[in-house]
């Protein structure tokens, strides 16, 4: 086959190829955009579950979420650095936030520089001061954040 014997140009076939390429690029852009928007969904969900337990005043479940260990009561010695009693003083009705009636995740972001977790900002009881909780990416434990970020 020589150049002069080339197949005839088929505009329908070329149109289908172009449309397929446009569709693939559009889907890829949408997937990348959604992945970026929901990049902290898991961490936000963990914190939302934690605050749901606090709203129900189920402090043992909240502590299990904080430590990411549902069987924490079987081996409380492993958590001597932040025992349940200290947790209850911080997050119970007598703690900084008082009785938690409402909690709404306001945003999430990593701290500046290299970080191993995500800071989740929560509006508690519609106060102007926000609670901020650190979620460690590797094991999903919660703690107090190493930095403070301002969310709008």
Whereabouts are the PLM-identified features?
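Ser/Thr/Pro/Gly-rich low-complexity linker/stalk segments immediately outside membranes or between
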Residues: 11-12, 38-56, 60
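Short extracytoplasmic
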Residues: 52-89
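A broad, low-specificity signal for short, low-complexity segments enriched in glycine/proline
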Residues: 9-14, 22-24, 77-82, 91-97, ...
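Hydrophobic membrane-insertion alpha-helices, especially the h-region
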Residues: 20-39
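N-terminal Lys/Arg-rich, disordered targeting/topogenic segments
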Residues: 1-17
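Exposed beta-sheet edge and beta->alpha loop/turn motif
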Residues: 90-152
